[in-house]
């Protein structure tokens, strides 16, 4: 969880969950209230007023879309609940929407979900028409790192050709050309 006032961080915390805590839930979607309440508890414990202009959550495994920031809507929520794969990231937009909906004039967003699809046609070839290319990668992290690197180099992400690897809870590699992972 992170709370910013403009570009100033007011709170940055990583909330971890034990296997035992999560084992009481048969499906990831059942963890919704648990995870939402932890966010609210963290805000309260740090005396952060529940008064926001926008709430952004980690994007889920919705239908493939280009990279960017998206406002949470009913179709996205439906796709997230009935996603092609089960992952905790599917709760990010749902939690953001629930929190935002309790505040006047507050909007909910996701950014660069793991299904960002910017592949060129040649990259879709798998060797068999029975095995279509499914694009799932750590887009949020990789694009953020690429943008930071570009700033440090005094240039724009869109002007660079890179190879980026995410080595965290999962592993993925992307080859962005001019700001689009191909």
Report the location of each language-model feature.
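Short, basic, glycine/proline-bearing loop/turn elements
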Residues: 23-29, 78-84, 130-131
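Short glycine-rich, Thr/Ser-proximal phosphate-binding strand/loop in the N-terminal lobe
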Residues: 1-30
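Phosphate-binding/catalytic loop of phosphoryl-transfer enzymes
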Residues: 89-182
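Short, well-ordered coil/turn elements that cap or connect secondary structure elements
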Residues: 4, 10, 49-50, 103-105, ...
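Short beta-strand-loop/turn "lid" adjacent to the catalytic site in phosphate-handling enzymes
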Residues: 43-89, 115-127
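Short, well-ordered amphipathic alpha-helical segments that serve as non-catalytic structural scaffolds
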Residues: 34-46, 95, 145
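Short, conserved beta-strand segments within well-ordered enzyme catalytic domains
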Residues: 2, 54-56, 109
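A glycine- and small-aliphatic-rich helix-loop capping segment at beta-alpha/alpha-beta transitions
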Residues: 6-9, 67-79, 105, 125-129, ...
């Amino acid at each position: 969880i992170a709370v910013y006032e403009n570009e100033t961080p007011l709170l940055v915390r990583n909330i971890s969950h034990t296997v035992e805590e999560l084992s009481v839930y048969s499906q990831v979607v059942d963890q919704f209230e648990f995870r939402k309440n932890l966010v609210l508890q963290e805000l309260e414990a740090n005396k952060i007023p529940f008064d926001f202009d926008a709430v952004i959550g980690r994007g889920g495994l919705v239908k493939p879309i280009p990279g960017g920031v998206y406002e949470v809507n009913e179709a996205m929520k439906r796709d997230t609940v009935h996603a092609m794969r089960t992952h905790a990231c599917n709760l990010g937009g749902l939690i953001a929407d629930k929190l935002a909906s309790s505040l006047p004039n507050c909007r909910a967003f996701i950014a660069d979900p793991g299904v960002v699809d910017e592949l060129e046609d040649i990259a879709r070839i798998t060797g068999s028409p029975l095995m279509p290319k499914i694009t799932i990668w750590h887009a949020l992290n990789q694009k953020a790192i690429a943008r930071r690197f570009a700033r440090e180099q005094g240039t724009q992400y869109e002007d660079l050709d890179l190879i980026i690897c995410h080595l965290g809870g999962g592993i993925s590699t992307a080859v962005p050309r001019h700001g689009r992972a191909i």
